[in-house]
């Protein structure tokens, strides 16, 4: 069963209404865990997840997930950081990941059907000049291939009136031919690990699921270590916070100065995972007790 976009819905709808709120981040984690343990129990505990924020580590830790991925573009965060977290979680817990690109944005969706209305700034209206640009869709599907995704694709709009391929469908068809011709691009090289504290609950400063900016766990304000995490990610992916807020599509794939070199891990990552990375960057204030394991990397 699919746990689809539920981390975003938890953060945006459930966490702000929680009572008592609780100011302790460890307690916030247990609140999150109880919520999704109940969901897993109801869905049979054989799950896949399409994350809408960056909480995939917490899902995969439970050992009941077989696949993890994210929907990119749309009104959603930067794809590069999405997959930094997804790769880190997948490598730690031995779960494959997939790629998905959306034809929607905050102002509508791309459609080439003859009955497409094409109303400006209407989220429920589709048209050939609306939604995610073809350029961004193409860049996303090929970067997902380079990110070692086991499957990639678009969410829809791949046909015109169910009669022939749309330009979106042709992009996917070309990607299939590219893979057939050149094969597996190989293992992506990510020499840097960015580590956050397991209980931090850090997420993107602003996002689709809440109008409240700079929150952790969906209900607590950023503190100094959270701004450090944001700042470190902005060094690697400058302007990533802008994703989805501008019609010029800035922020979804940033012109990063160092390439996509990083995976994001949490402080519970075992030593055998940490040793896969030549460089470890502590991008958060860690709970005490991590020192011995980190020093063992020397």
Regions from the language model: what does each represent?
Residues 1-298:
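Glycan-processing catalytic domains of CAZymes
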């Amino acid at each position: 069963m699919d746990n689809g976009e539920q981390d975003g819905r938890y953060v945006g709808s459930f966490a702000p209404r929680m009572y008592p709120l609780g100011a302790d981040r460890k307690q916030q984690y247990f609140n999150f865990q109880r919520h999704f343990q109940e969901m897993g129990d109801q869905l049979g505990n054989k799950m896949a997840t399409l994350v809408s924020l960056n909480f995939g580590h917490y899902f995969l830790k439970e050992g009941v997930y077989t696949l993890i991925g994210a929907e990119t573009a749309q009104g959603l965060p930067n794809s590069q950081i999405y997959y930094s977290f997804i790769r880190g979680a997948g490598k730690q817990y031995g779960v494959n990941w997939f790629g998905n690109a959306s034809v929607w944005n905050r102002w509508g969706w791309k459609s080439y059907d003859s009955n497409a209305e094409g109303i400006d700034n209407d989220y429920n209206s589709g048209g050939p000049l609306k939604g995610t640009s073809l350029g961004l869709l193409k860049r996303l599907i090929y970067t997902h291939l380079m990110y070692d995704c086991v499957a990639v694709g678009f969410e829809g709009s791949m046909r015109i009136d169910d009669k022939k391929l749309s330009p979106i469908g042709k992009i996917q068809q070309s990607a299939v031919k590219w893979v057939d011709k050149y094969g597996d691009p190989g293992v992506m090289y990510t020499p840097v690990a960015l580590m956050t504290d397991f209980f931090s609950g850090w997420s993107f400063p602003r996002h689709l699921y809440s109008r409240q900016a700079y929150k952790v766990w969906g209900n607590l304000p950023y503190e100094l270590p959270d701004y450090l995490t944001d700042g470190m990610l902005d060094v690697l992916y400058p302007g990533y916070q802008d994703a989805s807020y501008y019609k010029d599509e800035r922020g979804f794939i940033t012109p990063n100065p160092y390439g996509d070199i990083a995976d994001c891990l949490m402080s519970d990552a075992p030593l055998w995972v940490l040793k896969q990375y030549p460089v470890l960057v502590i991008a958060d204030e860690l709970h005490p007790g991590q020192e011995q394991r980190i020093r063992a990397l020397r």
